[in-house]
């Protein structure tokens, strides 16, 4: 993967692979499959600045599995990998 360095409080997330089969074996075509709203954090910005100019540390860490809103962020493609760039506030939870 190319090196991508997000700015401010932005996070780069690699979307989780979509399931193409249901547990009972039914194959779901790409046209009917909904994109999963979860992924793994692969890059972090340095954090946003507060009103006094000090950096606010990021709450998520590299490698965290996260949930995000359906319309969160921007989809990008880097080296044939589908990634999302979003603000940290668009992440709703860390999956532990």
Curated annotation (Swiss-Prot):
Belongs to the GroES chaperonin family. GO terms for cellular component: cytoplasm. GO terms for molecular function: ATP binding; metal ion binding; protein folding chaperone; protein-folding chaperone binding; unfolded protein binding. Gene3D superfamilies: GroES chaperonin. Keywords: Chaperone, Cytoplasm. Its main location: cytoplasm. Together with the chaperonin GroEL, plays an essential role in assisting protein folding. The GroEL-GroES system forms a nano-cage that allows encapsulation of the non-native substrate proteins and provides a physical environment optimized to promote and accelerate protein folding. GroES binds to the apical surface of the GroEL ring, thereby capping the opening of the GroEL channel. Coiled coil: none annotated. One of its GO terms (biological process) is chaperone cofactor-dependent protein refolding. It holds the Pfam family Cpn10. It is found in: Cytoplasm. This is Co-chaperonin GroES. SUPFAM superfamilies: GroES-like. Heptamer of 7 subunits arranged in a ring. Interacts with the chaperonin GroEL.
């Amino acid at each position: 993967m190319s090196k991508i360095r997000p700015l401010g409080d932005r996070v780069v997330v690699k979307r989780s692979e979509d399931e193409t089969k249901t547990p009972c074996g039914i194959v779901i075509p790409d046209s009917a499959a909904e994109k999963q709203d979860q992924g793994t954090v692969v890059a972090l910005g340095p954090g946003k600045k507060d009103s006094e100019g000090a950096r606010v540390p990021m709450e998520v860490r590299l490698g965290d599995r996260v949930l995000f809103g359906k319309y969160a962020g921007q989809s990008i493609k880097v080296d044939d990998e589908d990634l999302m760039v979003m603000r940290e506030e668009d992440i709703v939870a860390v999956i532990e």
